Amino acid sequence: MNAIVEQLKSTADATKATDIRAAFAADSQRFSRFSVSLDDLLMDFSKTAVNDDILKLLVKLAEEGGVEKKREEMFSGKAINFTEDRAVLHTALRNRSNAPVLVDGKDVMPDVNAVLAAMGKFADDVRSGTLKGATGKAITDVVNIGIGGSDLGPVMATLALAPFHDGPRAHFVSNIDGAHIADILKLVQPETTLFIVASKTFTTVETMTNAQTARNFIAKALGEAAVQHHFAAVSTALDKVAAFGIDSARVFGFWDWVGGRYSIWSAIGLPLMIAVGPENFGKFLDGAHAVDNHFRKAPITENLPILLGLIGFYHRNVLGYPTRAILPYDQRLSRFPAYLQQLDMESNGKGVTIDGTPVEGNSGPVVWGEPGTNGQHAFYQLIHQGTSIIPAEFMIAANAFEPELRHQHQLLISNVLAQSEALMKGRTFAEAKKQLTDKGMDDKKADFIAPHRVFTGNRPSITFVYDKLTPYALGRLIALYEHRVFVEGVLFRINSFDQWGVELGKELATGLLPVVEGKESAASHDSSTQGLVAALAKLAK
């Protein structure tokens, strides 16, 4: 595999990483040759540096790197998360074919379907008003309390599918900063609010601290006996859930083979299901399942997740681009970049290979972004003219949900297309100077000003086009990126499914709490930490 990477680097050097502008000028069919589709979902990667030779090498890289073999190991239930001895089967949660999926010889689909059915019944009862609060009033607000994968997925998807909301209002609390839950509690009434506490172990400090605040909110207003009527849980720690005061009939479980950042398809998606209904949640699963089938069956040259992963690897480990920008031209996808940030960086932000040796080259990039067109008036300046090349990934629906605002959607489309074209084409000195002289500027001044209006161009982007942001389309988009991250992880030769860096932070915070509370000395910590503790303590008084 290393030999192929070196070949890719040599090819990139020989072609100067492909002059994308020249490639379009020389090939009128470049778009059709370097774009692939899955039904209405189109992925255009013609505005990247990929050419025929590079694509052949990337395909060979996937073959020799074991992408297809590792893919089947994942789907078959092998414990590919070897540092925790766990299978990786979030795909089973959206296995709409209901074909058996085995973990340690046991078919998990009956359990998956049982939890999904229980979620559906509970969601319907909340939405219809059958399930009421302690005083007999229907639930009007649902507050999900979780963090990380128990928050980012539900927040992102619930916002993305706002046009499909016909259930109670949805709110989300994640940060241990008391301001977060305090602000949410100002928006809801105890008698008509349901809290969902999402924590597999029911020990996550942030989640349980916020859950206790919510419990006090209910108990103070309605009495201790009311707690059971206003809480549900997504957890496997039944004893701890019971001790908290939540009825076992309102507890929904999931499994060790579901990683937090892949858990939106599980009971963690309960607040989304309550917001949009079980039928739409089912369509969300359908979209992801369609991508799973495509990922398993399509040849590499037509396989969206594999191609996306190969291009991502090429950008990171061949061309050395350190970041990627996620730029959805859809305001309702405003949390999608943050969702992908966790998915990608928590999965592939590793420095050790599966053999326990240091990663050669780079592992995952920094992932960031904002929705268009907002980003155009913020950081696109750097993408266009900065010294770092930042691959951009655009997303745009052909149709919006507001037919009366069609003109605004057309403006949105024109902006995203203009940005991808501008990144590729740029503007030469001669073009910039002519633009200035055409406006009446004298030649000498134009020579001075023109360099500031030059855009180098040749900056890569991928554009995704789809019909409309439906539950099916969203499920498809998320699964596409999940599998992309998997492919890149295989090529980086890392375990994409553990997160020991997250665990380290938890350990250190737990150890520092007694120091912050003034119960223990800070002497065992470094001088910076000691100084910060002292400064904060002084201000707190």
Curated annotation (Swiss-Prot):
This is Glucose-6-phosphate isomerase. The keyword Isomerase applies. HAMAP family: G6P_isomerase. It catalyses: alpha-D-glucose 6-phosphate = beta-D-fructose 6-phosphate. GO terms for biological process: gluconeogenesis; glucose 6-phosphate metabolic process; glycolytic process. Keywords: Cytoplasm, Gluconeogenesis, Glycolysis, Isomerase. It is found in: Cytoplasm.
